């Protein structure tokens, strides 16, 4: 899906989140937003961040879903958007503060209709039974885990630690992966979509930067390079989702010492609807959640392997496309500035022997 330009006088409505720099932009009085505009934390040079955003999006788009398409705002687009957005919010609002923050690099992406996510925890850290049940229903589908495996293959390559954090992955135990951001596992209908593939918050060492010379993100790349690590990594990811749900179903405690109290009761079990007409409901005990997704390890692993293979084919095709033609033993000079794969991606490919 193409990302529409922000032209002068085209912005007719802007809404935004209060907790993070995310805005929804309506163009030309259309009935729904056309764009999402998001502020990414700057880590290093602006051009490095822009290259990383573009290439992370390209890879996820080709491996996972054509709706994934992120592009940095052009300066003229930023000016048009900011003028409209400033008028939409009170000067002391969180949205206005985000717009004035010089630490963000602003990107745009198409607005995806009917988008949902796997976040089941409220802002006050409480958990609703209905939200838990809905998330359980989503993760009890084989296709979800296969899609998620493909998304995570790209995440491993670009060092996106904002879905799963694998920095403490223990291959021997099949553990050590955490579900880093519940809201960053997103769905269009019953399918997982890998929006927001670039994550800079923990990339200060250059690991998340696709435009750098050093091949960073080595722990993630090692999982991609060694097929023997992948089954245990797949198990660790399914366990990460189980562990988070199991923990949150146990309620939440508040206060200290004698004043400590449970502000949300434990969910001993939940009953969910299923897609099976012969067994329309399923009772899930909290204790069973610990191993609930183990049967989906093979689906996640299949997606991970397929995603890695598709990513390799895509990048090798790009490498061939951008290579300068050779005639008479010499490379012809380019008639115009040459397109190229960022050095950081080439280094990652070399590390993976691609």
Residue spans of the language-model regions?
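General helical secondary-structure elements
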Residues: 9, 16, 34, 78-79, ...
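Conserved kinase catalytic-core segment
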Residues: 128-197, 201
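Short, flexible coil/linker elements and helix-boundary hinge sites characteristic
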Residues: 29, 70-71, 89-98, 122-129, ...
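Catalytic and binding regions of secreted/periplasmic enzymes and modules that target cell-wall glycans
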Residues: 110, 122-128, 132-136, 140, ...
